[in-house]
């Protein structure tokens, strides 16, 4: 794949939950994003291996059975493996969310966030902020 020249932000989305993948992909596309979807981490690493480059403006990761810290570490490895520049944001969405964190976003650093997903509006606000996209 080649880098797109239009202004539609591209999200590289790794989602291991089949039901969530379908609904979130649809919602993200309805919000106006170009979404490259991988059903699992192995495929995501395979896509980004070799000489080709898959352009993404943001990496969004939801791995089943992983703690937020584990998902962040894996997401950082994927972002580095993908040869994204030092300015590509990473957002992880933990599978299990403590009730008191539901609907919140935790800033780990300027480029890494944990989204304790409650609804698409929450994710939309975070993505808009990170991608400087006016929706």
Where are the model-predicted features located?
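Conserved dinucleotide-binding and phosphotransfer motif residues
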Residues: 30-31, 81
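Short acidic, S/G/P-rich loop/turn micro-motifs used as interaction or catalytic elements
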Residues: 17-21, 42, 61-70, 96-99, ...
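A short, hydrophobic beta-strand element within the central beta-sheet of small alpha/beta folds
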Residues: 59, 83-100
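Conserved phosphotransfer microenvironments
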Residues: 54, 59-86
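Acidic, metal-coordinating helix/loop segments flanking the phosphotransfer/catalytic sites
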Residues: 39-58, 62
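Non-catalytic signal-transmission and effector/linker regions of two-component phosphorelay proteins
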Residues: 1-22, 27, 53-55, 83-87, ...
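Alpha4 helix (beta4-alpha4-beta5 surface) of REC/receiver domains from two-component response regulators
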Residues: 69-73, 92-116, 121, 125
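Short beta-strand element of Class I
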Residues: 35
